[in-house]
């Protein structure tokens, strides 16, 4: 399994070391989730609060900044058929957008490192791309447990 990550830091905040951590973490998450053999692709953007607020307003009807937004390309709506990638082309998972200011604020509020919070948000977004959600209490419990399991497997604990 191969995962291609198109990463754009619109804030010019992330270090090379942090970008490496992100790539390694996403590969770990893909292994943990046992993605089928093949090539996968996702885009990952790091933005300001203003940029994520605009996306949140335009696509979710919530005129406020948030920490992470995901747009799953493989999400199948009611009455829709799943789209299979053409042979030899990557399976496009979707887009993850993270607010760097919100990530920094939450890291301070929760008393852990910026990297830990960044990893949490990215894994959260990645799981949404794979179909996880937290609309019900049971879904939320399952999703948040998966997030913690992946972060622990990678060696990023809350402390």
From Swiss-Prot:
Molecular function terms from GO: metalloendopeptidase activity; RNA endonuclease activity; zinc ion binding
Gene Ontology CC annotations of this record: cytoplasm
Family the entry assigns: Belongs to the endoribonuclease YbeY family.
EC number: 3.1.-.-
Cofactor section: Zn(2+)
Function: Single strand-specific metallo-endoribonuclease involved in late-stage 70S ribosome quality control and in maturation of the 3' terminus of the 16S rRNA.
Annotated binding of Zn(2+), by residue: 124, 128, 134
Cofactor annotation comment: Binds 1 zinc ion.
Disulfide bridge map: none
Protein known as: Endoribonuclease YbeY
Gene name of the encoded protein: ybeY
UniProt GO BP: rRNA processing
Keywords: Cytoplasm, Endonuclease, Hydrolase, Metal-binding, Nuclease, Ribosome biogenesis, rRNA processing, Zinc
InterPro entries attached to this UniProt entry: MetalPrtase_cat_dom_sf_prd, YbeY, YbeY_CS
Subcellular location: Cytoplasm
């Amino acid at each position: 399994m191969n995962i291609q990550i198109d990463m754009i830091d619109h804030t010019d905040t992330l270090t090379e070391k942090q970008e490496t951590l992100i790539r390694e973490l996403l590969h770990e998450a893909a292994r943990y989730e046992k993605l089928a053999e093949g090539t996968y692709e996702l885009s990952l953007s790091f933005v300001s609060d203003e940029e994520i607020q605009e996306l949140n307003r335009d696509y979710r009807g919530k005129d406020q900044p948030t920490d992470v937004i995901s747009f799953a390309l493989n999400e199948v709506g009611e009455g829709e058929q799943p789209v299979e990638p053409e042979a030899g082309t990557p399976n496009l998972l979707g887009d993850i957008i993270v607010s760097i200011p919100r990530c920094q604020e939450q890291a301070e509020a929760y008393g852990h490192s910026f990297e830990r919070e960044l990893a949490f948000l990215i894994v959260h977004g990645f799981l949404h791309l794979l179909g996880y959600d937290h609309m019900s209490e049971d879904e939320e419990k399952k999703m948040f447990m998966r997030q913690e399991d992946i972060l622990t497997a990678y060696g990023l604990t809350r402390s």
